[in-house]
């Protein structure tokens, strides 16, 4: 069950419900801290105790399997589902490896222990410091407030003013600490998804490739590792985008705390003191009060519980409210109310004069004044001048800068952006700007385009359809995602749909050059999700949906040809693509449910063997041996080739784009992640996050000491000529690695006959053979051919030819 978001506006109310929700976050943080300590402890045992290696692995796997991610919001993205299930997958792998007695690599501590320890000390430790400051400031403020409220109104005016100033200062410090603490604890809650998983992923990667006895297991692990790394990178991109929006919201909340009133909230709420008369005197009791103006209902929750009995909230119906005269009572900030349920007058004391005025205005039916409006930037309009501006920007970008690295991600100068916008939207001569002028570089033009779209009075995809679009992106039915978004696009107003088509067509063109500019559909979704879609209210809950806005834009880019081919068929429900045997839903990537292979006995060879020996390719490197490999294997699998070699029998793997052009798919290099973790860093460089590095090759980690084992049997594929796979390659010839696509679809989970059988050219030469019963072999063949299918896991429909 997920935790509800902590709204910054609740920091200023400090309600019991807010404290209870904050306590849940603190318990989760402590649980995470304990979990990290357990992982570090078990990891050290695994590294140091070689004699007890098997038992240490078992304990470590149990620790991983016992942890379950909690999340903010009501729905996870596909990538977050993969991350949430990752520890269970890791635990299954470790249990499988336990019987093989793998050797631990010498630098495992740098890969696993240090990043987790740094995260625990720097992030969680910093959060605990924020908590101490928050509790200390809160205790100081409320104790001072209690003393302040007991001051008699007969004191000197100078003393009262000085006391007021002191209370205001402590209140400001307390609210500042509360905002910082809420922001920090939510940031750690979100960032732990990748900050905890990444070190474990890198540790497992090094563990598998460092021992020759686990070559086959590593071969099964590679597709999962790459998909999980993509999920981590996408989640990190979503987190960065969300964090920027939340920082802006935090700044706005500091300027005007009451601006973020959600629908359904009480008109006013806060703490009040009630005068209660007893036989032996008068006492003031603290209540948390909520007033609903429409129903005139005042809900009072006592904060000082009587021993032996728990008092519940009291609902009163207000009759009228009047300010208490200053000379009639020795307390300040008092006002009287009468209710239907209680006879007589109830005297209430507010926290300040301003607070009393707010309560009075709410209760006597006057129009409430809760905040001073935030100064917004000048809003743009979606008119002819705007269309002209967007078309000019797109033309100059596609003409001069479409291959610019980091296009749209790199921002331009704010001064130049404002200068360009002011010149173009000048009421005297709108549109009179020469974009070919040397003053306007590509970064300035892209930033101006984003600024215009983000500051429209209403976003391109409208407030009206925002919830429906986000709801469609949250669906785990991949067919429904595309069908619902397809239908909703044609519910947009005409000019909005025209603008959206213009922009998405341009983004498709940009993504076709992702090899040069490193901007994939996923990266473009992160940039244009908050730009084309935004919620009407500024709340933390809305910020948490930014990742689903990104998914909507990503689907629009990847399925542009299908969506804009024409409107869907008219029906009551959103159209769904052609039916399947079973509705295709997103399932977390997994490798633990595969059939186990019979492992071949390996004999390690000397490190001094000559380089002229026969080389046998595995997904993790080359196994060198002078022994001729034996013939048929236990399970058939596809031939593995290295990139760079052309095979006349098959085409090079490419990632299709929506218009049919092919482009080599980038490779997720976990070696870079390993190097980064060894250096002590925890932040992926922008290029590694946004896409592949041009010219990057397999990264070698010299600290890994890997013995070269004897060869194992090569696999023959049943769908092709087995002889072509069993041939020994010359020593100088390097085979090509067939890489899975950027966003590989789900692994095959059923043996369903497709409605339209398609021939499978380019797999092997010869006639197709029988379908293998091995899940591992079928998955390997699936990833070999998946690079010819379009789309990603965020809405890809394998088999769609439109």
UniProtKB/Swiss-Prot annotation:
GO biological process: actin cytoskeleton organization; cell junction assembly; establishment of epithelial cell apical/basal polarity; negative regulation of proteasomal protein catabolic process; nervous system development; regulation of endocytosis; regulation of synaptic transmission, glutamatergic; signal transduction
SMART domains xref list: PH, RhoGAP
Biased composition (Polar residues): 616-627
Alphabetized GO MF terms: GTPase activator activity
Main location: other
Occurrences of domain PH (ranges): 265-368
Compartment(s) of residence: Postsynapse; Presynapse; Cell projection, Axon; Cell projection, Dendritic spine
Site feature location: Arginine finger: 409
Residue numbers spanned by region Disordered: 569-589, 607-770, 783-802
Comp. bias (Basic and acidic residues): 716-732
Segments forming domain Rho-GAP: 380-564
Keywords: Cell projection, Cytoplasm, Endocytosis, GTPase activation, Neurogenesis, Synapse
InterPro entries: AH/BAR_dom_sf, BAR_dom, GRAF_fam, OPHN1_BAR, PH-like_dom_sf, PH_domain, PH_GRAF, Rho_GTPase_activation_prot
An example Gene Ontology CC term for this record: actin cytoskeleton
Purpose: Stimulates GTP hydrolysis of members of the Rho family. Its action on RHOA activity and signaling is implicated in growth and stabilization of dendritic spines, and therefore in synaptic function. Critical for the stabilization of AMPA receptors at postsynaptic sites. Critical for the regulation of synaptic vesicle endocytosis at pre-synaptic terminals. Required for the localization of NR1D1 to dendrites, can suppress its repressor activity and protect it from proteasomal degradation.
PANTHER family xrefs: OLIGOPHRENIN 1 (PTHR12552), OLIGOPHRENIN-1 (PTHR12552:SF2)
Subunit record text: Interacts with HOMER1. Interacts with AMPA receptor complexes. Interacts with SH3GL2 (endophilin-A1). Interacts (via C-terminus) with NR1D1.
Name of the protein in question: Oligophrenin-1
Species whose genome carries this gene: Pan troglodytes (Chimpanzee)
